[in-house]
Amino acid sequence: MTNDDPGGHHLSGDLLAAWTTGLAWDEHRSWAMAGHWSTAATIDGVTATLAPISAHHGRRADQLRTFWPQRRGGTDGAASPAGPPTPDDGPLLDLANALDEAQRSLGPPGETTWTGTTSMAALRLTAQLILPRFLTCYKQLLKLANAPSDASIRRICELALTDTTADFVTATAKLAALGENPGPSQIDDIQHAGMGQNPTHRPK
């Protein structure tokens, strides 16, 4: 029961709970944020791009919730105490921090006056900050799901990678269409996403 993970980690029950709970919550947060951004944006192309991305986040959140373990008090994994941190938790922490940063950048719903600049910032945060970190998380979870019993979670990860990669490429292409041509680093990220490799994380 090994793969290319040098640490030999695999999905114990607690690790599966931590990952599916964390990812489901982050997908839910992203569904809400992207949904708000899509309606608040003042550029039609941004609205048209972010609305389906929001829907994809919501669908993945629902799929991940099916893996939450039954615990005393119900199935709400978020109510269960977190286990000790492991080396595999890094991508989840990076993703949570990215969502916090995005929320701070654009402000809570109803407290920001949206302009074209704000709309472009929302699309930029989606393409260059949020989606690349989801890709990293799903690739890490796919690596951990290396036991025969993990087939269902591997399938969820494969579907999520396909959706998220497509959203990443679409959002980046829309940035270019709206006049923000990707530099070499963004082109490199697009190519890596298409090849199934980890997109690089650039300074924001």
PLM regions: where:
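Iron-associated oxidoreductase/ferritin-like identity signal
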Residues: 1-204
